[in-house]
């Protein structure tokens, strides 16, 4: 519960506790173009009216506290307070509501995702009057988004750097993720790149462990990249994970990558933190490095339907903080991701202007005002039989990443890479010829396997592998 706030000194100070809704529930409010808008899924405790719950969220995530304080009279709360301006029940759910909250732009530090999240979600999620709370979406106004650099380079600049157009990019996470020596790790990188992949990748928890220190890994991977480039005539890359225990150490690793002349580094943006990520993104733009982002820890935050933060919000935050790639689920693989929900936040990552579309979970129209886009990365439990669906779902502006689906090939790493490259080229050609990949995809793969023994072997190994579990987070 919270005060009805009077901001004029002549009124005088009246101590006490009053309902939040008397001050922070304002259904007559017309949102401003400069407001940050939030859509919260609110589950109040029994006996708490939805208007009070929505107002409590607005208050506790902006200027309010649990009781009237005399310093309220020293400022204009009408200028600075958050406002719950609309509440609607969630269809099919009992005692659950979407509360829309508007925040004045002056509440937030320019160019700081850290400050934005500290304000909007930093404290209110532990509020006792709420059984559960989930931040479903944010509208970031151009007046705020223009204070951010955003991705270091973006989709078009990356394609120009790599000289690769008209198809998704292909990647592979090196497995086993832990335990290889740096030299054996570099060998696997070389074999995959030589076989036809565009990128290989450090897994999210590959940092600098006793069995493989980061500098040794960087050196052997750089050697692998240059050797594969010389043999194939294509530009290659390996996502060198710069994530570290301190921001200073992270930057030291990024500097080493730049000195080695490699094209791309990597960061775990949630475990590493938004402040560190934004610093790294600025360095990458200034020094010509692409930045791959892994979302390790995201499911702790976003998987539960009633509590937490939806990934579309984390995706928007990443676009502002900075990254050229980010993992975005696969729809068809082993990791969580319902199709319409996934395509909704994929558009929020890639496009300049995204219309409100509740059928895909997009609560607000978002205008990025020419901020560079981010390539979504499909990774996790995918193999050659998934290639038609992945090509059809994600389109050209994506990275399709096969870890076990490359390194698990019965003939070795390079043949695994060949199989994936052949499958991708076949799917792109079939699509360009007007064939329906959703309906004819398996036939396209079978036809291509007649001319590629590597693809035929991969098709045989993974013909029975499926991950058919219902998504937890559905619209």
From Swiss-Prot:
Modification type N6,N6,N6-trimethyllysine: residues: 14
Modified residues (N6-carboxylysine): 201
Annotated EC: 4.1.1.39
Keywords, alphabetical: Acetylation, Calvin cycle, Carbon dioxide fixation, Chloroplast, Lyase, Magnesium, Metal-binding, Methylation, Monooxygenase, Oxidoreductase, Photorespiration, Photosynthesis, Plastid
Enzyme class of the recorded protein, top EC level: lyase
Cross-referenced PANTHER family: RIBULOSE BISPHOSPHATE CARBOXYLASE, RIBULOSE BISPHOSPHATE CARBOXYLASE LARGE CHAIN
This protein's name: Ribulose bisphosphate carboxylase large chain
Organism: Nymphaea alba
């Amino acid at each position: 519960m919270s005060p009805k706030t009077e901001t004029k000194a002549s009124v005088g100070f009246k101590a006490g506790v009053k309902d939040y809704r008397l001050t922070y529930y304002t259904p007559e409010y017309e949102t401003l173009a400069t407001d940050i808008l939030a859509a919260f899924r609110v589950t109040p405790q029994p006996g708490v009216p939805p208007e009070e719950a929505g107002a409590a969220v607005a208050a506790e995530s902006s200027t309010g506290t649990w009781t009237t304080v005399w310093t309220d009279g020293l400022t204009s709360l009408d200028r600075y307070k958050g406002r719950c301006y609309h509440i609607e029940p969630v269809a099919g759910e009992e005692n659950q509501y979407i509360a829309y909250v508007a925040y004045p732009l002056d509440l937030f530090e320019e160019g700081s995702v850290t400050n934005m999240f500290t304000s909007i979600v930093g404290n209110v999620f532990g509020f006792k009057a709420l059984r559960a709370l989930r931040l479903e979406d944010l509208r970031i106004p151009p007046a705020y988004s223009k204070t951010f650099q955003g991705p270091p380079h973006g989709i078009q600049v990356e394609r120009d750097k790599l000289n690769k157009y008209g198809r998704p990019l292909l990647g592979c996470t090196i497995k086993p993720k832990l335990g290889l020596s740096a030299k054996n790790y570099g060998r696997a990188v070389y074999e995959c790149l030589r076989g036809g992949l565009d990128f290989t990748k450090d897994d999210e928890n590959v940092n600098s462990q006793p069995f493989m220190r980061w500098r040794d890994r960087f050196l052997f991977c750089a050697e692998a990249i240059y050797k594969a480039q010389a043999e194939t005539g294509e530009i290659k890359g390996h996502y060198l994970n710069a994530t570290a225990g301190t921001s200073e150490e992270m930057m030291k690793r990024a500097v080493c990558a730049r000195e080695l002349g490699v094209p791309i580094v990597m960061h775990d943006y949630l475990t590493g933190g938004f402040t560190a990520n934004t610093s790294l993104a600025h360095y990458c733009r200034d020094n010509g490095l692409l930045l791959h982002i892994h979302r390790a820890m995201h499911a702790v935050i976003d998987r539960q339907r009633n509590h937490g933060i939806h990934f579309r919000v984390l995706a928007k935050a990443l676009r502002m903080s900075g990254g050229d790639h980010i993992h975005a689920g696969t729809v068809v693989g082993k990791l969580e991701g319902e199709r319409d929900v996934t395509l909704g936040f994929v558009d929020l990552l890639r496009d300049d202007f995204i219309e409100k579309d509740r059928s895909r979970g997009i609560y607000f129209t978002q205008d990025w005002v020419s901020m560079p886009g981010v390539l979504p990365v499909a990774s996790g439990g995918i193999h050659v039989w998934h290639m038609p669906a992945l090509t059809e779902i994600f389109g050209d502006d994506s990275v399709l990443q096969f870890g076990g689906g490359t390194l698990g090939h019965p003939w070795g790493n390079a043949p695994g890479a060949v199989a994936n490259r052949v499958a991708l080229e076949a799917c792109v050609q079939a699509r360009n010829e007007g064939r329906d990949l959703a309906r004819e995809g398996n036939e396209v793969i079978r036809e291509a396997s007649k001319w590629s023994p590597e693809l035929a072997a991969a098709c045989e190994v993974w013909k029975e592998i499926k991950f058919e579990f219902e998504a937890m987070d559905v619209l």
